[in-house]
């Protein structure tokens, strides 16, 4: 199975963080699965790293490097991914929670027919079958 990691899942995975569930660890470590991180996540890490509101010390360069060292493949953003975002049903998602990172990551997974691994309880509100909650 091809699996795209939500940004927080990728961060938890590369840091071996205790928030990463057993199910997530099993899916990520399964040799039959191919694991991807997105260029969008690199951008999200950059913004969070530079924001005084966050205490993320991980730089975007470190994030990308550690993901690659963990055996994850990078998924680049394409026009197809952006256009797929318009097919997401946002009607059940509160306006203040319509995170553009979430929408683009989910649309990437949908466009590529990948599963999307997340712990974000708002993601299932989009109703996409590709979502795996962990």
Protein language model annotation of sequence segments:
Residues 57, 69-119:
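Active-site neighborhoods of divalent-metal-dependent phosphate/nucleic-acid chemistry enzymes
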Residues 111, 115-117, 121-134:
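Charged phosphate-binding loop/patch that engages nucleotide di/tri-phosphates or the phosphate backbone
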Residues 1-37, 53-65, 121, 126:
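Short, well-structured N-terminal submotif of metal-dependent ribonuclease cores
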Residues 36, 75, 132-133:
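General small-molecule cofactor/ligand-binding pocket signal
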Residues 16-17, 48, 88, 129-130:
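Residue-level signal for well-ordered alpha-helical positions
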């Amino acid at each position: 199975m091809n699996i795209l990691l939500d940004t927080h899942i990728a961060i938890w995975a590369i840091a071996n963080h205790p928030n990463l569930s057993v199910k997530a660890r099993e899916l990520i470590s399964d040799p039959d699965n191919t694991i991807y991180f997105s260029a969008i996540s690199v951008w999200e890490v950059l913004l969070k790293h530079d924001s005084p509101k966050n205490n993320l010390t991980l730089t975007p360069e470190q994030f990308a490097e550690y993901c690659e060292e963990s055996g994850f493949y990078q998924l680049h953003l394409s026009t197809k991914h952006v256009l797929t975002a318009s097919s997401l049903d946002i009607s059940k998602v509160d306006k203040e929670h319509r995170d553009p990172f979430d929408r683009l990551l989910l649309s990437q997974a949908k466009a590529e027919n990948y599963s999307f691994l997340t712990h974000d309880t708002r993601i299932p509100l989009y109703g996409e079958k590709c979502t795996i909650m962990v």
